[in-house]
């Protein structure tokens, strides 16, 4: 068993972040560690799946839109990170991700979510007093190569006020029609409230 650790760092200003780390089993109970220090960022979520259909697990790690969301291609057991394999513009405020073939075409898709709003979208606002939900979770459809210039789809707005932080995705065929639904778990976002109130958990 190998381990992959997402580097988050200290969750306070200036949110400097941290680098990711892999612990690769040596087969004798010990591990060799690999630090990806050149890709330090504010990582939150990730997932594993066979993105390129070569029979092994690749990894995605998302950093909330700082330009260093990564795809780690698995090349014979060596993880090679690249920020050029994922559309960074679609990763704005995306803090969680899953890999799942949602359209059943044989290619793994990337489903990402995080903050359902964009920072600073209205410069006349103080805090989040008049921001709106404009940054819904996104599906980037896979092609067996990367997630660049691919078709993508925004998920419908949740309609659940003040629960605009996506914490996880699950997949299940609720109505037995042969098509899998996406289950999204959320938590409170402090939107349109007074500053200084605690986050809902």
Regions found by a protein language model. Give the residues of each.
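Hydrophobic beta-strand segments that make up the repeating blades of beta-propeller
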Residues: 2-7, 59-63, 110-114, 182-186
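Repeated polar recognition positions within modular binding domains
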Residues: 8, 16-18, 42-45, 63-67, ...
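Blade-edge motifs of beta-propeller repeat domains
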Residues: 19-41, 72-92, 124-164
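Fold-core signature of tandem repeat domains
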Residues: 23, 51, 59-60, 72, ...
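Extracellular beta-rich repeat passengers
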Residues: 167, 200-201
């Amino acid at each position: 068993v190998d381990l992959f650790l997402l580097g988050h760092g200290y969750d306070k200003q200036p949110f400097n972040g941290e680098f990711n780390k892999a612990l690769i089993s040596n087969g004798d109970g010990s591990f060799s560690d690999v630090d990806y220090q050149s890709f330090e960022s504010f990582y939150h979520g990730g997932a594993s799946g066979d993105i390129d259909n070569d029979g092994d697990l690749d990894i995605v790690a998302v950093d909330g839109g700082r330009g260093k969301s990564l795809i780690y291609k698995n090349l014979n057991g060596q993880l090679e990170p690249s920020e050029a394999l994922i559309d960074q513009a679609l990763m704005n405020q995306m803090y969680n991700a899953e890999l799942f073939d949602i359209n059943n075409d044989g290619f793994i898709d990337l489903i990402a979510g995080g903050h359902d709003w964009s920072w600073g979208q209205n410069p006349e606002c103080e805090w989040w007093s008049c921001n709106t939900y404009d940054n819904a979770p996104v599906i980037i459809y896979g092609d067996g190569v990367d997630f660049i210039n691919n078709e993508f789809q925004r998920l419908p707005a949740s309609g659940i006020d003040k629960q605009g932080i996506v914490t996880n995705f699950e997949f299940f065929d609720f109505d037995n029609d042969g098509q899998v639904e996406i289950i999204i778990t959320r938590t409170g976002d402090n939107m349109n409230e007074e500053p200084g109130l605690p986050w809902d958990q």
